Amino acid sequence: MRLLIAAVGKAKAGPEQDLFRQYCRRLSPPPVLKEVEEKRPLAGPQLKAREAELLLATLPEGAKVVALDEKGRDIGSVDFAHRLRDWRDSGCQDVAFLIGGADGHGDAVRERADLLLSFGRMTWPHMLVRALLAEQLWRAHSILTGHPYHRP
């Protein structure tokens, strides 16, 4: 199953980017990262709608979509791994994870998402969310393959 991470904004060099890459390299094949950015000076609802368009344009046809959202479901690592396993076992070829901009996701992303996922009620910096997601993808892989990285 191929994994795509589509994110608003360009990653800057730093420890968050290093951590993201470290976890992605552990996965085979590693997730593909697509970064989108709106250059025009839009604000509020217009910006969210435009960022949603840009994110949705990155999706492979038929992909399952997970939107990272502070109002999403807060699930454990094992449940997350099982969700990915179930999609894989049902023949899903692509899963796309969408990370919105500073104002969150536009309605179009929320409507398209198969899962709205939260990493808790706290607000996280977008670059750190990438690293958290990559770690959880590695952890899910570890859970599903019996690798000792994840200890229940």
UniProtKB/Swiss-Prot annotation:
Cited Gene3D superfamilies: 3.40.1280.10
Keywords for this protein: Cytoplasm, Methyltransferase, rRNA processing, S-adenosyl-L-methionine, Transferase
GO function terms (MF aspect): rRNA (pseudouridine-N3-)-methyltransferase activity
Cell compartments where the protein resides: Cytoplasm
SUPFAM superfamilies xref list: alpha/beta knot
InterPro entries: Alpha/beta_knot_MTases (IPR029028), RlmH-like (IPR003742), tRNA_m1G_MTases_N (IPR029026)
Enzyme class: transferase
EC number: 2.1.1.177
The keyword Hydrolase belongs to this UniProt entry's keyword annotation: no
UniProt keyword annotation of Methyltransferase present: yes
Catalytic activity: pseudouridine(1915) in 23S rRNA + S-adenosyl-L-methionine = N(3)-methylpseudouridine(1915) in 23S rRNA + S-adenosyl-L-homocysteine + H(+)
Entry GO CC: cytoplasm
Xref: Pfam families: SPOUT_MTase
Residues engaged in binding S-adenosyl-L-methionine: L68, G100, F119, G120, R121, M122, T123, W124
Disulfide bridge partners, by residue number: none
Family: Belongs to the RNA methyltransferase RlmH family.
Function: Specifically methylates the pseudouridine at position 1915 (m3Psi1915) in 23S rRNA.
Subunit composition and interactions: Homodimer.
Record protein name field: Ribosomal RNA large subunit methyltransferase H
Gene this chain is encoded by: rlmH
